Amino acid sequence: PMTNFDYLRDIEPLHDLYTFCQGAEATMDSDHDACALHCRRGLEWLVKAIYTLKNAEIGERKSLYELMTGEPFVVFLEDDRLITAAHYIRKVGNIAAHAGGVKSSEAYFCLLNLYNLVGGTLLKLRVLTSLAPFDKTLIPKNGPRITPRETVPAPVRQFVESVPAEAVGSKTPAPIVTEYSEFETRKLFIDLMLRDAGWELVGKDNVAMPNKAGTEIEVHGMPKQDVGYADYVLYGSDGKPLAVIEAKRTSKDPVIGKHQAELYAQCLKDQYGVLPVIYYTNGFQTFVIDGLGYPPRQILGFHSQEDLLVIHRSR
């Protein structure tokens, strides 16, 4: 049967990459943790390949995170969406490797992100001239269990030598092969960032619970229509809001969410007597206003409950 990564099968120098991608797709339905690990191995191969092509030093002890935030990788992709997609795979891969318990939606999104990363990279490197969007109907049901490999081999010389130098140094961003659905993408990225910071979602809209992250929380006192709905509110153990998160369309500048988030924060302050820390994000870029008098700054993830308490106490 056809799979999404079949196109790699006959490209001999990409045999290792094909193994990782194929393993990820085969286990997506049957073993979410394994799928996430296969995706992470594929990502690691890709990152190392980009460094090798750029003659950049990988270094013995550099972590995947260090390589991914390094200039060779970031400048090569030149697209916030793909960089965020790569970090998504890295983070879910970490969950799979340590605690386990990757969800079906997370495994699927890892696979989709891997497809876009591999495709975008190979198109930019002119290894491919075209690639169809990801087709989720091709994912095998109850696929075989394939144990992820422990190590990631270096890209073979044959591959490195086959790529034209001008493609490696090209300023053109790597293309996006499969468009992300706005809502799904934003939600999956934000939910993972919350999970990463130790926040548990309530699981039902407009429910405020101590120590949990509530979604679509009704707030009163908004200008014009009085009632508004905050995308996420993070509650402390006393049931008061520690933070509010406003998510805007990924295609929009996240600053559009800033004004909205500030309005929600003010309404929550009027209700609870405490001003929440403000986050606004488009899923790919996230900013915080901590209420300590600093201008908004970009961050890689949300604060944990403890860190938010520290911010509140420092005011």
Language model: regions and residue ranges:
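ATP-dependent helicase/translocase motor core
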Residues: L123-R315
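Amphipathic alpha-helical interface elements
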Residues: P1-P155
